[in-house]
Curated annotation (Swiss-Prot):
A motif (Effector region) lies at residues 37-45. Keywords: GTP-binding, Lipoprotein, Membrane, Methylation, Nucleotide-binding, Prenylation, Protein transport, Transport, Vacuole. This is Ypt/Rab-type GTPase ypt7. Ypt/Rab-type GTPases are key regulators of membrane trafficking and intracellular vesicular transport. They act as molecular switches that convert between GTP-bound and GDP-bound states, and regulate virtually all steps of membrane traffic from the formation of the transport vesicle at the donor membrane to its fusion at the target membrane. In the GDP-bound state, Ypt proteins are predominantly cytosolic, solubilized through the interaction with a GDP dissociation inhibitor (GDI). Belongs to the small GTPase superfamily. Rab family. Rab activation is generally mediated by a guanine exchange factor (GEF), while inactivation through hydrolysis of bound GTP is catalyzed by a GTPase activating protein (GAP).
């Protein structure tokens, strides 16, 4: 990857405590799973370098605390994000029902330049658990995504490494596209209106 321009992309992972955000992040970056992770305090992050469309991309993945008492810290971590990953546990209906509040809070705190097109992705985690324990159907999750601008959806298992790599490949592409679109928008700044009197010149020939 030497010689290629590198892009740093900030990705925020949000969801209720216990849905598996830390496990998903560690499975993606380190290809490891542990059932003994402690609840994240505040926020933590890992980085991974990948190649996306012949571009070297460093993903900075922020794993944020799912407890309400840490949500006030959001503005410090969310600003400058290029993509947001929403995670819920398919076996926990409450974790699905609170997704909108996480999404709305992110948009308020992060203040992206174009909230309507800012890239989100939804992960339904812990699909390795027995089917009879499942509380949120795939069709319900897809309906949620469709109603919010066709958000990409993956059903994942951090434990079994199901769809984790595939999900973050999509994250990297979405984040890179968002960064590129922001760069283009920045090139089209407001026109500068000059005082016409100051532009008048005289030529004495």
């Amino acid at each position: 990857m030497a010689g290629k321009k590198k892009h740093l992309l900030k990705v925020i992972i949000l969801g209720e405590s216990g849905v598996g955000k830390t496990s998903i992040m560690n499975q993606y970056v380190n290809r490891k799973f542990s059932k003994d992770y402690k609840a994240t305090i505040g926020a933590d992050f890992l980085t991974k370098e990948v190649l996306v469309d012949d571009k070297v991309v460093t993903l900075q993945l922020w794993d944020t605390a799912g407890q309400e008492r840490f949500q006030s810290l959001g503005v410090a971590f969310y600003r400058g994000a290029d993509c947001c990953v929403l995670v819920y546990d398919v076996n926990n209906s409450k974790s699905f029902e609170t997704l909108d509040s996480w999404r709305d809070e992110f948009l308020i705190q992060a203040s992206p330049s174009n909230p309507e097109t800012f890239p989100f992705i939804l992960l339904g985690n812990k699909v390795d658990v027995e089917e009879q324990k499942r509380m949120v159907s795939k069709s319900k999750a897809l309906a949620f995504c469709q109603a919010r601008g066709e958000i990409p959806y993956f059903e994942t298992s951090a434990k079994e490494a199901i769809n984790v790599q595939e999900a973050f490949e999509t994250v990297a592409k979405l984040a890179l596209e968002n960064m590129d679109s922001d760069d283009i928008a920045a090139d089209f700044t407001d026109p500068i209106h000059l005082d016409m009197e100051s532009q008048k010149t005289s030529c004495y020939c």
